Amino acid sequence: MNGEVIATTTARSRLPSALGAGATLLFIGQLHAAPVTESAEQKPTSQLSTVVVQGARLDENQRAETALKEVAGGVNYVDSAAVEKGRVSTSTDIFALQPGVIATQGGGSNDGTRISIRGSGINKGVGYFRAGIFYLFDGLPVSGPGGTPYELFEPLGLSHTEVLRGGNAFDIGSLYLGGAINYVTKTGYNSAPLQVRYEAGSYGYQKRQISSGQVLGPLDYYVSLTDSASDGFQDQTQGKSAGFAGNVGYQFSPQLKSRLYYRYRTTDNETPGYITRAQLKDDPEQANPASVNVRAHRKQPGSTWVASKTQYTFDDDSNLEVGLVYHDYPIDARQGVNRTTWGFSDYSASLKYDRLDTLFGKNSITRFNALRTEHLNAYAKTKVRIPSGITANLPSGALVRKAEYEGSDTVLSASNETEWIDNTLWLSAGLSAVEFQRKAKVSYPVGGEADNPNNPIEKNDWEFAPRVGVRYQINPNWQLFGNLSRTVEAQQSWAYVSGAQVFTSGPATGLNSGGQKLEPQIADTLEFGTRGQFGNNNWDLTFYRSHVQDELLSVIIREATSTADALTSEYNASKTIHQGVELGLDSLLYQNNGDSLHLRQSYTYSDFFYRDDEQFGSNRLPGIPKHNYQAELRYDFSNGVYVGVNTYYASKTPVDFANTKDAGSYNLWGAILGWDSPKKDWNVYLDLRNLTDEKYAASISPTFNANGNDVRAIIPGDGIGAYAGVQYSFR
């Protein structure tokens, strides 16, 4: 809608507060930039000098992107409309070409995508609870003391996604090393009254969606139903899912609005287990025989996320937001000779208040945030699935072990950002206080108390996390930023029942007999960078260095066999360093009569290593390649046709902490051809992946010391594939 926007000094306006992949696509020109709106937070207003602008008003997505650019650190903004021009299977497709975000897909179309930012959850493979990143839907938490289950993260039905890397997620209650990812759902204001979408392709892949959204006076709604199925590239990777996402909003007055959210989703994925590098090169479609023999698979039989958010804007342009969340996420893991059913349910409550004042005659924004998430119920029951070995004489379904968990996370934070030089210099400072409560015990068999003195294990920690930041606007097209932040995170509640202490007799032999002491991970991070535009180039460049104490790591200490399940241990590492470079560049190479040629590139340098560890010295931490480079060269015609080629390069990474063996580097190539109707009704595409049929390790789960042996630690990525899709929007 066209209109006139007027801002004066007396009126306040809303402040939505390489390596190369071969030798073809290289970094060209300068560098690119971009990121929390009502999506992650509603910012207060600021006073501006008189400006009259004739043109279109900013829509919700544009306001969100503008607000993210006001963060004094590394951020990403992902517009779902751009993502939906190709295959949208999992979150891996959302985070393609995003600097600083490592997202890899293995194990078929498993929603348990491996996502890491600045080394967060560095050792977590595909299908694990996500760690080290705070996840939200529409500014309300999904993550909690049990970690982050992945099944609700359906990538269709989103308006956009916001990534605040590292300490830059401070103002939304995140104190995680990797920062926060906020998935923002469509509403009635930015969706079609009816939309249908269908995708199909290699390895039996199919996905369907039907959605609807409208504005009906003061009320608006959006609903989306999806289902998908895949046979999988690798043996033992068949999967299926189905889900619903929706919300209803009501504008009671210009100052008061409220929105209710509901998500429900089920998934069922076969799990292939890990293979060796030699097996990968010989036949990447093969699965671990131990997984095949027991037909290992993992079900999320029905996860629910229900939330409400109410926002009130006071006359003095301060804002209050109250949020409530209920999250239930059961798991049925049938991945070995035993079957473990997990029951988790959490509640979250959040309170955010921000206001604009003047300090020494300058605009000053103050924010307060309180967030608490607590387990209502949390347990794991392990039962006999396939009687064998020590359970050979027990019936299927017999209880072997039960573990129970309690936990809560409470974050209180206050921050201020002041504009010390008009439209030029902003200084910010904040402090968070966080309390972690954890309790874990093995309640059956009772003998666990005798076998492990740490049963039950209980932890209660208070920590403080300060942050200072600066933004300097050299000119309208060039910004410098920097910050010094502390992040603090506790281990997931269930992970306290891990380690080397196991039962030595009875049906539970080999299973953990109790808890182990795990300290919170603390990281101090210095970050600085720049973003802006020069000519036809948009850039975003960030450097960071984190000094990490008690880093939370995981390792396989016993592989699965035909008679026993695998055993994974969580532990605190000695001092480590995480440092890196995050670079994004979007270059307009050609433009004429509505046609354009763009080159988008992202490079992520990840240097993570021990600081003089007694056993591993200065070894690299396994799991994340040191170099990740992505690029896409795409030509867009004025009639809506687009064609492009893309590449992804990842360097080798160790598969063990001793650095005696590695998973090799790889280089993937792809291409895309599509048509996006100028009327915004039809979209069709053909998305080609891994054109050279590269055999590569998409994810690894490391061991302590491979002693140079080719251990089973690899999950392969998909081979060559073709995917086609069509979408129609009834406007």
Model-derived segments and spans:
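N-terminal periplasmic "start-of-domain" segments of outer-membrane beta-barrel proteins
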Residues: 50-86, 111-116, 133
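N-terminal periplasmic accessory domains that precede
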Residues: 94, 114-116, 133-136, 149-151, ...
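Short acidic/polar hinge/loop motifs at secondary-structure boundaries
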Residues: 125, 132-133, 138-165
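Transmembrane beta-barrel wall of Gram-negative outer-membrane proteins
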Residues: 193-195, 200-229, 234-272, 297-315, ...
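Membrane-embedded beta-barrel scaffold of Gram-negative outer-membrane proteins
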Residues: 214, 309-313, 319-325, 331-332, ...
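Structural signature of Gram-negative outer-membrane beta-barrels, strongest in the C-terminal barrel
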Residues: 253, 353, 363-365, 371-373, ...
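Gram-negative outer-membrane beta-barrel transporters
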Residues: 360, 419-427, 435-436, 538, ...
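C-terminal beta-signal and adjacent terminal beta-strands/loops
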Residues: 488, 652-654, 675-731
